[in-house]
Regions:
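Conserved redox-active cysteine motifs that mediate thiol-disulfide chemistry
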Residues: 83-100, 122
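Short pre-active-site segment immediately N-terminal to redox-active cysteine/selenocysteine motifs
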Residues: 77-79, 84-87, 119, 159
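Thiol-/selenol-based redox modules, centered on thioredoxin-like
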Residues: 159-193
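Conserved helix-turn-beta segment immediately C-terminal to the redox Cys motif
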Residues: 77-78, 93-116
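N-terminal targeting signals for export/organelle localization
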Residues: 6-58
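Residue-level recognition of beta-strand->loop/alpha-helix junctions
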Residues: 116-118, 145, 176
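A short beta-strand-turn-helix
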Residues: 59-79
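Short, internal strand/loop/helix patches
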Residues: 113, 127-168
């Protein structure tokens, strides 16, 4: 008995950081009701991860208006995922440029998505927190809450902000735009468009 306990103690508790959505494919996709641009993803689209050449899972998140937003609804757009936290000063600095950047490229098929993974108390952000972020930084692009708990996959190192660029087929082309400044972000967007 003591050897069994010792073995369990040495192995420890390892959380399983996956969900049913990790293996989702396009056949499960459903249109969401919101005012953002939307296109049905191609048949056979499958989630594989957040690394270069992979397709992120179809995360369904709340926006600053309380509406459901699907990542895959932006299929056909070049998408920048700005993974931020409310308490993060560099994230706040970057947020001041979000709307200018989005508006400059929106007509070319670009979508800027801010995904807040934590509020000031390191909890999942509420719609009120999303709305405050959008208001404080004059963001009219989607501000989303990581309510499905992808934080450990989105920011495995805990370093905010993380900027992931997706091409028009939802494939990750850059898994961390660095340095995270507006000039560099714009250069990467222009390359992708």
């Amino acid at each position: 008995m003591s050897s069994l306990l010792m073995m369990l103690w040495s192995v420890g508790c390892v959380p399983v950081l996956t969900s049913a959505k990790d293996s989702a494919d396009q056949s499960c996709w459903e249109t969401v009701d919101n005012d953002w641009v939307s296109q049905t993803p191609r048949n056979g689209l499958e989630a594989s991860g957040f690394g270069i050449g992979e397709t992120p899972p179809d995360m369904c998140m709340k926006d600053q208006f309380g509406n459901d937003v699907s990542l895959w609804q932006f299929y056909g757009q070049v998408v920048l995922l700005d993974i931020s936290a409310e308490w993060c000063a560099p994230c706040q600095e970057l947020a001041t440029e979000v709307d200018h950047t989005w508006k400059d490229y929106e007509d070319q098929g670009f979508m800027y998505l801010t995904i807040l993974t934590e509020d000031l108390s390191s909890q999942i952000p509420s719609v009120e927190v999303l709305d405050k972020w959008a208001t404080d930084f004059s963001v009219t692009a989607p501000v989303l809450s990581d309510s499905e708990g992808y934080r450990t996959q989105l920011v495995p190192t805990g370093a905010y902000p993380r900027l992931i660029l997706l091409d028009r087929t939802m494939e990750v082309t850059i898994d961390n735009v660095t340095p995270a400044n507006d000039e560099n972000i714009r250069a990467k967007i222009e390359e992708a468009l």
